[in-house]
Amino acid sequence: MGFPKEGEKVQIHSYKHNGSIHRMWEETTILKGTQSLVIGANDRTLVTESDGRTWITREPAICYFHANYWFNVIGMLREDGVYYYCNLSSPFAYDLEALKYIDYDLDIKVYPDMTYTLLDEDEYEKHSKMMKYPPVIDTILKRNVEYLRKWIHQRKGPFAPDFVDMWYERYLMYRD
């Protein structure tokens, strides 16, 4: 598996466990790319849903992908602070087409005061049965929910103070 290079513009593709496309982000600028970590940024990028509907993101976002964890984190810069959306997902893969991951339904929304809510447990239960997630996936995802909770409480990784602001400043250097 390769990895995207700094300054490169890539698509992000999210899939479901059964291999079907879930969502695509048209353009994300890579700010850091290594075998184990990718940090990207986008602002007002086109998003295409699996049913063909499209929408445009409303605010700048910093995207954090790690090869050793089963989640990715999007930090969204809004007027009243940074909001985070954490997707429980497979670790990322990259090919010349896009940065890719499998979305496993569960999400954690984190507010600027670092309180958070676990979302979509019902969707996870439904898809787990429908797509026959193996028990090992359930174990891995539950462990990674706990990792995320610890990171949020410890302000670690993408939740560290100034993490999103620092990477957003770097992103501004690449804007056209």
UniProtKB/Swiss-Prot annotation:
Active site positions, chain numbering: R23
Keywords from the UniProt entry: Hydrolase, Magnesium, Metal-binding
E.C. designation(s): 3.6.1.15, 3.6.1.6
Disulfide cysteine pairs (residue numbers): none
Positions of Mg(2+) 1 binding: N87, D103, D107
Residues that bind Mg(2+) 2: D105, D107, D120, E123
One Pfam family in the UniProt entry: DUF402
Reactions it catalyzes: a ribonucleoside 5'-triphosphate + H2O = a ribonucleoside 5'-diphosphate + phosphate + H(+); a ribonucleoside 5'-diphosphate + H2O = a ribonucleoside 5'-phosphate + phosphate + H(+)
Cofactor(s) of this protein: Mg(2+)
Family statement: Belongs to the Ntdp family.
Functional note: Has nucleoside phosphatase activity towards nucleoside triphosphates and nucleoside diphosphates.
Name under which the protein is recorded: Nucleoside triphosphate/diphosphate phosphatase
Organism of this sequence: Bacillus cytotoxicus (strain DSM 22905 / CIP 110041 / 391-98 / NVH 391-98)
